[in-house]
């Protein structure tokens, strides 16, 4: 599996975001095993244990922009029970949160505030872009709306829909957990490579492309 390596670039200008240099590399743990099998296996076990704890205890930041936020909060109700995934502890401060959900329309005036909130979150941190407006601007192709929050934030998971159902948000959360389980992060600021290795995860659209094309018994609009 290919990984995307991101390193901090101290010489980057302040307006560049995310600040870092990216390149496609192989799994660093496999390279470590080839060099020293004992240390490589030990690092693999430690990394797996740390990632397991991170992905099963994700604290979301209580933040919303538009109607998609209503669908996100619905996922916290009893019928959906987001507590099954360990993500029910909503934080009122970005300094205590693990991930942020950009749910709704992001206006240009709001972009600096969102970026400031993201910068206040401590590492490791992740971003879920929820809804068509957050993903690409949606139907608001106008001067006042940012055409996708990935213009100024590093997005980990995109949840399509206008607005997405709570089930779609839960699937996005599970995809984020899967991605976190395969991440390679430094165990300490003084131990190991300080770069962040993220697995190159294929999109669900591409994974199900052949399955959807093979469908021939299409239902009428009255039956959907």
Swiss-Prot record:
Keywords (A to Z) from UniProt: 4Fe-4S, Cell inner membrane, Cell membrane, Iron, Iron-sulfur, Membrane, Metal-binding, NAD, Quinone, Translocase, Transport, Ubiquinone
EC numbers on record: 7.1.1.-
Gene name for this UniProt entry: nuoB
Domain of life: Bacteria
Keyword Iron: yes
Species for this entry: Pseudomonas fluorescens (strain Pf0-1)
Name listed for the protein in its UniProt record: NADH-quinone oxidoreductase subunit B
Cofactor binding: number and manner: Binds 1 [4Fe-4S] cluster.
Membrane topology: Peripheral membrane protein
Summary of subunit composition and partner proteins: NDH-1 is composed of 13 different subunits. Subunits NuoB, CD, E, F, and G constitute the peripheral sector of the complex.
Keyword field contains Cell membrane: yes
Assigned protein family: Belongs to the complex I 20 kDa subunit family.
Reaction(s) the record says it catalyses: a quinone + NADH + 5 H(+)(in) = a quinol + NAD(+) + 4 H(+)(out)
Main subcellular location: membrane
GO biological process: aerobic respiration; electron transport coupled proton transport
Region listing for Disordered, in residue ranges: 200-224
GO CC terms: plasma membrane; respiratory chain complex I
One Gene Ontology MF term: NADH:ubiquinone reductase (non-electrogenic) activity
Enzymatic class: translocase
Residues noted as binding [4Fe-4S] cluster in the record, renumbered to the chain: 67-68, 133, 162
InterPro entries: NADH_UbQ_OxRdtase-like_20kDa, NADH_UQ_OxRdtase_20Kd_su
UniProt cofactor(s): [4Fe-4S] cluster
Annotated function: NDH-1 shuttles electrons from NADH, via FMN and iron-sulfur (Fe-S) centers, to quinones in the respiratory chain. The immediate electron acceptor for the enzyme in this species is believed to be ubiquinone. Couples the redox reaction to proton translocation (for every two electrons transferred, four hydrogen ions are translocated across the cytoplasmic membrane), and thus conserves the redox energy in a proton gradient.
Regions of compositional bias (Basic and acidic residues) in chain numbering: 203-212
Cellular compartments annotated: Cell inner membrane
């Amino acid at each position: 599996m290919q990984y995307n390596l991101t390193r901090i670039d101290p010489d980057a200008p302040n307006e560049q975001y995310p600040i870092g240099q990216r390149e496609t590399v192989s799994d660093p743990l496999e390279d470590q095993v080839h060099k020293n099998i004992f240390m490589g296996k030990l690092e693999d076990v430690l990394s797996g244990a740390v990632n397991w704890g991170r992905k099963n205890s994700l604290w979301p930041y209580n933040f919303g922009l538009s109607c998609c936020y209503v669908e996100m909060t619905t996922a916290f109700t009893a019928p959906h029970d987001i507590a099954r995934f360990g993500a029910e502890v909503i934080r009122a401060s970005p300094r205590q949160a693990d991930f942020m959900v950009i749910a709704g329309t992001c206006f240009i005036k709001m972009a600096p505030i969102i970026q400031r909130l993201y910068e206040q979150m401590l590492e490791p941190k992740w971003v879920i872009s929820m809804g068509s407006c957050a993903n690409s601007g949606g139907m608001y192709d106008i001067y006042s709306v940012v055409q996708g929050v990935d213009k100024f934030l590093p997005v980990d998971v995109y949840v399509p829909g206008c607005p997405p159902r709570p089930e779609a948000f839960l699937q996005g959360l599970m995809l984020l957990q899967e991605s976190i389980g395969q991440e390679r992060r430094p165990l300490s600021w003084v131990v190991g490579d300080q770069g962040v290795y993220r697995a190159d995860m294929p999109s669900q659209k591409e994974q199900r492309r052949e399955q959807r094309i093979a469908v021939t018994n299409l239902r009428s609009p009255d039956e959907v």
